[in-house]
């Protein structure tokens, strides 16, 4: 994350960092297990088509190249570090896809200091959970065991006690969507069976299920 933020330079002020690479920044429990390492960094940009493509040109000028080995159309690679960078638009018509909670992620982002003079805009924990649940619904295919999106959500539920209060203060539409997604999980017998294997500490499965139940009401 830091290598991408530094490579972007002042361009980073225009994007909001999202996705699995920021999960560790949203964990507030000092005793929580480390989150999974990711191969790439995600960011979203609020811009029209012309501005988005101009921003892509600026990214290329900062030492990034399109990852021609990937079929992910938003993927870049930082040539010096080799770190992958997915730059996504908020508006779905620009690249043909988006996430319905990206606008909320941009609206509620906050600055966070990574140290050594590097500051980024970080999505909120509520936006993280909402976007990840949306992604799981779209590409997860109900595969609990192999979904990094679901794993990321469970890590935040486990490692951020204040998430309950944050969700309670979220917009009604988002709160209802998240609650519905959690309700579908808790009533799924297969999910209950595999939950201990999805988290770093299987002994916390009951606590996580309890929190999921409370969020789904």
Pin down the residues of each PLM region.
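Compositionally biased terminal segments of proteins
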Residues: 1-217
